[in-house]
Amino acid sequence: VEKYRLTDAARTVDYQENGVTHKFTLRQIEALRDFSDIKAGTLGGWIEEESNLSHDGDCWIYDHNSAVFAGAVISGNARVTQPCTISHGASLTGECWADRADISHGAAIYDRAMIQMSQVRGECRIFGDARVMHQSQVIAAVGLTEDRDQRLQIYDNATVNGSRIVHQAQIYGRALVNHAFIEHRAAVYEDAILEGNDENNVWVCDCAQIYGQARIVAGNEIDQCPTIRYSSQVFGHALIEGDCVLKHHVHVFDDAVITGGPVQLDDRIKICGQARVTGNVFIENQVTVTDDAVIEAFNGDPLHLRGARIISGNEYITRTPVIGAI
């Protein structure tokens, strides 16, 4: 039984892509019967054709300023509230909710996922109880890496706030991503927390992974943006805060703490145990800092450690050793 009809009211929407303006003619929907919280006669949003909105389930386009067109499909019990634009093959189904969102170009939103005040574009999947909110941008792109088939995914109970998630990134578990830039095939999962702010993002890229109960926290001063790159991993209960850059094959885990001023770690570095690194520190080439060891630079003076070695026990290093000098 049909639950709505296309009214005679029509409007044209312009959609710009690659510098070309495309025009779509839409019709407003009107409910023909009562269902869910909709009463017969209720006017809804605008669609290009009936294939855009299923007659089955309780799915509905609530706002009079919402538009669904160009092969997009709303089905199941999906809800579209506040002004939304759903287009170009996007699909919303299950119990998902789009609220003041722009969703397009093959994005698939399902289960109980929520997209609020955000943009989702490209062939990605957002599902489970995932939430994408507060002016986030999710821009999927495939074919840019060796894994040409991997799709960007945000799922489980992951929450993304005010962040930019692009390419083939994966965010899942109970991960909390605030004011971050996640790109390429980077992954944030389990109970990891990324805490950027209005001044500085947390940047995770390449094939880096943040997981366990790790926390990456941006500072409030200029250039206090933590950057996790290449195949680096941060996990366990590790904390990284401020101007820190992790490059090739860096592992920070257990209860290690790194506080940037700035800190740069590169080439098979392990910071673990209860170790602490702080200040203007550069560590490279197969150095392990573990146990209760502390590497601390004072007054902005640079401290440089390099070459295969293990710093352990209660070692406390505050200046560049002669053997480690540049």
PLM features per residue range, with description:
Residues A70:
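Glycine-rich active-site/cofactor-binding loop and its immediate structural neighborhood
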Residues V1-D58, H64, N77, P83, ...:
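Terminal amphipathic alpha-helical/low-complexity segments used for targeting or macromolecular assembly
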